[in-house]
Amino acid sequence: MAVFFVNGTEVTVEKNQRLLRYLRDTLHLTSVKDGCSEGACGACTVLIDGEPIRACTPFTDSLAGRHVITVEGLTDEEKRLYTYAYGEAGAVQCGFCIPGMVLCTKALLDRNLNPTDDQIRYALRNNYCRCTGYVKIMDAVRLAAKCRREGVIPEASENDWKLGSSVHRIDVEEKVLGYGKYPDDWYLPDMCYGSAVRSQYPRARVLAIDTSKAEALPGVVRVITAADIPGENKVGHLKHDQYSLIPIGGLTHYLGDAIALVAAETPEILEKAKKLVKVTYEPLPAVHNPPEAWAENAPRVFDEEESNVQAYKHIARGDADTAIKNSKYVISQHFETPWTEHAFLEPECAVSYIDPDGYVMVLSTDQSSHTTLHECKLLLGSDKVRVQNQLVGGGFGGKEDMSVQHHAALITYLTGRTVKVKLTRPESLLIHPKRHPFWMDFTMGCDENGIIQGVKAKVYSDTGAFASLGGPVLERACTHAAGPYNYQNFEIEGTAYYTNNPPAGAFRGFGVTQT
C-alpha cells in the first residue's frame, strides 16, 4: 500500500502496480498515454516531485509521500500557455506524444526560462515524436519560454482565420491537454478485454485447438475460434486473403496469425486464459524471401493459390534492349532494400459495443474506416455495424489494414459485451504491414557524355503473409523505376511474392523509395 498525491489530491493505492496503470485504469487520467509499457517512448511522462518520469516504470509502492502531476493537473494559465505555444509553433500532428512533451517543457521552464537549444534537446531526450522531426516542438518550447519571460500569453482568435494567414489546428487544445480520445482512452461500463492467441510458427498446419481449460477459468467471457465466425473468415484491404482466425486444418501464414480470440473481465485474467488455449501444430517449411518463393517446388504460402506470386507488373516504352546494346557504357547492379517499420507511437486498439440502435459500434484508430466497416460486415454476416474513427496516434500507411477492429466487433457480436482489444507493442511490431523489402537488378546504358539511353530492371518485392497493398506498391515501384530523367527506352518487370514474413503494405513513398 502507498499514500501519495496526484494533481494535489491525496490517494491511497492498495495494490502495488505500475503508476501508468493506476493513473489510466483507476483514475482515468488519459493524458498519460501508453505507447510501449517498457520505458522507451516517453508518451506516458508525468512529473514526480517536478522531475519528468515515464509512468510505466515506477511501481506505486515506491511513491509514498511523493507528488505526481499529469497534464490534467496543470494550472489554467499553464494550460493556456502550452496550448498556445504548441499551436502557434505548429508542433502538434497526431498528438499522441504531446502531453509528455508538455510536461518535459514545464519541468525545463520551471528551472530555466532562457534554455539553449542543447538544453531543450536534453530536456526532450527521453520522448519520441514520430511525426514532426522535433523542429516544431523545439520552436514551441522556445515560444513558451518567451511567453513566460514576458508574462504574456497571446490569444489565438478565430477572427484571424483568413486566406493566407497561419491558424492553429482545430484539435490543438484536445491534443495538448490530452483529453482528445484515442480508442484506448475509452473506459466504458461493463467493458471486458479481448486478445488473440497467435501462431507459434510462421507456416504450420493447425491440427487441433483445445479451449476447455481457458473457458473454465473464472472471469473468462468467451473463447472464439474460426468455427464461431458467422460470416466470411477472410478480410483484406484490396484482396480478401487475410484470415481473421485460422481454422482447424488451416495453414498459418506468419507468426501474427490469430488462432483464437479470448475475452475476459480483466487484462490479468485475459493473459492467464490465453496461455491455457492449447494449439496442436504440424510445423512446415516456411518461405522467408522472394528467392525462396520463386524457387522450383517452393512451399506455397496459401494452399488455395497456384503459386506464391501475389502481383505482376510490366511497364515498357521504346526499345530498351537495342538502346542498351548501342550504348557506349553499360552498367548492371543488384540492389536490396529492407523492410521498414512505421514506428507510430500509438499501438492499435479498438473498442466495440452495442449502440442504442442495436448496431455493433467499433471505435477505431484507422486510416481506412470505410474499408474497415465493409470488412467487419463481411465477417459478421450483418449490415448492423458502424465504425467511428477516433484520434489516430500516427499511421503513415501502417493503419490502413485491419488489425484489431474485426476481432473487437466479433467479440461484441457473439457476446453482446463491450470490449477493448489492444495490441502490445511487440504484437504491433509483428502484425501491421511494413514497407516492402525489394530485390532489384538494374541495367543502364549511356552515351559517351553520360546521357542515359535505356534502362532495364527486374524488381521483386516481399509482400509477406497477405496482399495488403502489394499490387499498388509494386505498380508505383515499377512506374518510378526509370527515374525522373528524360529518355525514351525502358522496360521494367515487377513481381510481388507472398512469403511467411509479416505483411508489407502502405508506407509513405509507396514503392517509389525502393526503386
Which residue stretches match the model-derived regions?
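Flexible, low-hydrophobicity surface segments
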Residues: 145-310, 330, 414
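Short acidic, glycine/serine/threonine-rich loops at helix termini
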Residues: 83, 105-109, 142-143, 233-238, ...
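Beta-strand segments within the central parallel beta-sheet cores of soluble alpha/beta enzyme folds
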Residues: 35-38, 118-125, 226, 384-391, ...
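Acidic, glycine-rich active-site loops and adjacent beta-strand->loop/helix elements
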Residues: 62, 74, 229, 366-369, ...
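Signature of N-terminal electron-transfer/Fe-S-associated modules in redox systems
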Residues: 1-156, 174
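Glycine-rich and small/hydrophobic secondary-structure elements
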Residues: 141, 240-270, 398-445, 504-515
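Alpha-helical support elements that line or immediately flank enzyme active sites
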Residues: 101, 110, 196-226, 260-280, ...
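Glycine-rich loop/linker segments at domain edges
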Residues: 90, 165, 171-177, 238, ...
